[in-house]
From Swiss-Prot:
GO MF annotation terms: histone H3K36 trimethyltransferase activity; histone H4K20 methyltransferase activity; histone H4K20 trimethyltransferase activity; protein-lysine N-methyltransferase activity; zinc ion binding
Domain of life, per lineage: Eukaryota
Any GO BP: regulation of stem cell division
Keyword tags: Cytoplasm, Metal-binding, Methyltransferase, S-adenosyl-L-methionine, Transferase, Zinc, Zinc-finger
UniProt domain SET: residue ranges: 29-358
Presence of keyword Metal-binding: yes
GO CC annotation terms, alphabetical: cytoplasm
Family statement: Belongs to the class V-like SAM-binding methyltransferase superfamily.
The name this protein goes by in its record: Protein-lysine N-trimethyltransferase SMYD5
Record organism: Gallus gallus (Chicken)
This protein's encoding gene: SMYD5
The reaction(s) this protein catalyses: L-lysyl-[protein] + 3 S-adenosyl-L-methionine = N(6),N(6),N(6)-trimethyl-L-lysyl-[protein] + 3 S-adenosyl-L-homocysteine + 3 H(+); L-lysyl(20)-[histone H4] + 3 S-adenosyl-L-methionine = N(6),N(6),N(6)-trimethyl-L-lysyl(20)-[histone H4] + 3 S-adenosyl-L-homocysteine + 3 H(+); L-lysyl(36)-[histone H3] + 3 S-adenosyl-L-methionine = N(6),N(6),N(6)-trimethyl-L-lysyl(36)-[histone H3] + 3 S-adenosyl-L-homocysteine + 3 H(+)
InterPro entries: SET_dom (IPR001214), SET_dom_sf (IPR046341), SMYD5_SET (IPR044422)
Location in or out of the cell: Cytoplasm
Higher taxonomy: Eukaryota, Metazoa, Chordata, Craniata, Vertebrata
Length: 420
């Protein structure tokens, strides 16, 4: 979601921990202020070819989803790199410990590099990630021997969040906790506060009379409970505004509208590596058939929840506005939190670079349905070429969508936050 004002290009490309986009980003794209209503946008500074990586970016802060971690989707506590081998990953998703994957040498997981925090035993994929976490936020958030103590303030906060926010998950209270911890540990606290302030944090779009779906009257009690637990666990005088009722709502809106989903999978990495193998035709057909059947079996056992999942705040990516016909997309091909923004078509210098905030299925729904999702989650009504072309369509969903929405609207809200 594009922020409201200011220039983040220098900050996003700077040397501060977690803020380094690839140097190529400086040449390929830059953030520009568009209007007070739309905020910033990302624009090409040169011609970009289809399939080209516009930039690669680390998040300012990121965190694995709490239910995802609880269900043993093992990921690095800092960069979210999947920690299971591809075979272990497939065995768990299938519920079949006897499964053996062919071509095990194509698995890129290096267990010999994994390290744990000596105090709380959270696991990292490398010494570099353990050190990066320690230097940025983990000194504040390390639970030490209290990791399994349900009365510890941080554990109470996480349990309350899990009881309000069931899968499919879209954010985590720990993303907010890591923001606070980052500022508390920082030598230059004002710099980090300013960096976080670059993200859009409005709780409502007054011009269009839209409020974020998780900040309505229905959820006032849950938000106040979270705020009190958040304050007990993390209060800091220099960040006192974040702990007030309105400040907490703004912080909540910030991670809700700017948080970029992150997905990693050692199995997916193994599949991509196998796809690149130069094999005789018969062996290629056998391997492809094995992989196809493997995914069918996993879908029956585990459904759609295949990846280690979390979310992060990305300075440059957050400047990308939405389009229902995007010219770029985000992905995580390195099996960690490094975000690649890749062109879906040729983009000319001066052209705005847009991604879609909707998934593929949502983009195929009616204009009314698409904008319902965008208003509730991102506080705007889309005016992309596709939406303008469908402007005269009835402001109702199709019969099929109407029936589905009637059955799922309340359930979706309950999935997001349930009464406690």
């Amino acid at each position: 979601m594009a922020a409201a004002a200011g220039d983040v290009r220098g900050a996003a490309l700077g040397a501060r921990p977690g803020l380094g986009a690839a140097a190529a980003a400086a040449a390929a794209a830059e953030a520009r202020f568009i209007s007070s209503a739309k905020g910033k946008g990302l624009f090409a500074t040169r011609s970009i070819r289809k399939g080209e990586a516009v930039f690669v970016e680390k998040p300012v802060v990121s965190s694995q989803f709490l239910w995802n971690a609880l269900y043993n989707y093992r990921a690095c506590d800092h960069c979210l790199r999947a920690l299971e081998t591809a075979e272990e990953n497939a065995q768990r998703l299938l519920g079949r410990s006897s499964l053996v994957l062919p071509h095990p040498e194509q698995c890129s997981i290096r267990k010999d590099l994994h390290q744990q925090c000596p105090r709380c035993q959270v696991t990292y994929c490398s010494a570099e990630c353990r050190q990066a976490a320690l230097e940025q936020y983990h000194q504040v958030l390390c639970l030490g021997p209290s990791r399994d103590d349900p009365t510890h303030p941080l554990n109470k906060l996480q349990e309350a969040w899990r009881n309000m926010h069931y899968p499919p998950e879209t954010s985590s209270i720990m993303l907010m906790a890591r923001m606070v911890a980052t500022v508390k540990q920082a030598k230059d606290k004002d710099w980090w506060i300013k960096a976080f302030s670059q993200f859009c944090s409005k709780t409502a779009n007054e011009e269009e009379e839209i409020a974020h779906k998780l900040l309505g009257d229905k959820f006032k009690g849950q938000l106040e409970l979270l705020r009190l637990l958040f304050t007990e666990a993390l209060y800091d005088e220099q960040l006192s505004r974040w702990f007030t009722p309105e400040g907490f709502r703004s912080l909540f809106a910030l991670v809700g509208t700017n948080g970029q989903g992150i997905g990693t999978s050692s199995l997916s990495q193994w599949v991509h590596a196998c796809d690149a193998l130069d094999l005789p035709m018969l062996q290629r057909e056998e391997l492809d058939a094995f992989i196809d059947q493997l995914y069918k079996d996993i879908e029956k056992e585990s459904g759609e929840f295949l990846n280690c999942e979390g979310s992060g705040l990305y300075m440059l990516q957050s400047c990308c506005n939405h389009s229902c016909i995007p010219n770029a997309e985000t992905s995580f091909p390195d099996n960690n939190f490094l975000l690649y923004l890749t062109a879906l078509e040729d983009i000319e210098a001066g052209e705005e670079i847009c991604i879609s905030y909707l998934d593929c299925c949502q983009r195929e729904r009616s204009r009314h349905s698409r904008n319902k999702i965008l208003r509730e989650n991102y506080l705007f009504t889309c005016s992309c070429p596709k939406c303008l072309a469908q402007a005269d369509d009835p402001d109702v969903t199709s019969d099929e969508e109407e029936e589905a929405e009637g059955e799922t609207d309340d359930a979706e809200l309950e999935d997001e936050m349930t009464d406690v």
